[in-house]
From Swiss-Prot:
A lipid is attached at residue 28 (N-palmitoyl cysteine). It is found in: Cell membrane. Residues 1-27 form the signal peptide. This is UPF0323 lipoprotein HPG27_212. Residues 171-209 have a biased composition (Low complexity). Residues 159-170 have a biased composition (Polar residues). It comes from Helicobacter pylori (strain G27). A lipid is attached at residue 28 (S-diacylglycerol cysteine). Belongs to the UPF0323 family.
Length: 216
């Protein structure tokens, strides 16, 4: 099987820890299958993954600034000072479970109408909701997809988890290029807003993939 390689230019927009992690992901598939039974169903799809960079905003919320298809799922958090760290699988699972509870009781920003109508800085997505609005959320949180799949508020708010329309479009384009392999795995091939709308094996209602959800 051919290993995926990226052009050097693909890494120009990410730096520091995120660039090092991305290079290690692309150049070496190695540890993806080292512990096949260790992880729960929450993260069993990790090798059908996404490389996601979340950036802290001034209001302590988080936005997706970059994401790419990857053999494994890695989520990097960049703080206001530019420091980066990789979230552990345990941290990711905890964040998703906490966000699931908020979805169940209706307090998640992902399912609230128009997310309060705030601006990019004021939209208030925490780490959990930012993760579930990204490609990684459709993979790691696929087991709660039914709770979001037909939710029109989620479909709009998922776009708002991205820092800009350009970041969202880069993600769309990046995953579209890998659509054959992603679709064969039931993964996150993306032609719709909200990754839960395209990660399911059954057909899903069409949703606009424009930039309607962004406020500047």
């Amino acid at each position: 099987m051919k290993k995926p390689y990226r052009k050097i230019s693909d890494y120009a927009i990410v730096g520091g820890l995120s660039a090092l992690v991305m290079v290690s992901i692309v150049g070496c598939k190695s540890n993806a299958d080292d512990k096949p039974k260790e992880q729960s169903s929450l993260s069993q799809s990790v090798q059908k993954g996404a490389f996601v960079i979340l950036e802290e905003q001034k209001d302590k919320s988080y936005k997706v600034v970059e994401e790419y298809p990857s053999s494994r799922t890695h989520i990097i958090v960049r703080d206001l000072q530019g420091n980066e760290r990789v979230l552990s699988n345990e941290e990711i699972q905890k964040l998703i479970k906490e966000e699931e509870a908020k979805i169940d009781n209706g307090t998640s920003k992902l399912v609230q109408p128009n997310n309060g109508g705030g601006s990019n800085e004021g939209s208030g997505f925490g780490l959990g909701s930012a993760i579930l609005g990204s490609a990684a959320g459709a993979i790691l949180g696929s087991y709660i997809g039914n709770k979001l799949f037909n939710n029109p508020n989620y479909q709009q708010n998922a776009q708002r988890t991205y820092k800009s329309p350009q970041a969202y479009q880069r993600s769309q384009n990046s995953f579209s290029k890998s659509a054959p392999s992603a679709s064969s795995m039931g993964g996150a091939s993306k032609g719709q807003s909200g990754f839960f709308g395209s990660s399911r094996p059954t057909s899903s209602p069409a949703v606009s993939s424009g930039t309607r959800g962004f406020n500047s």
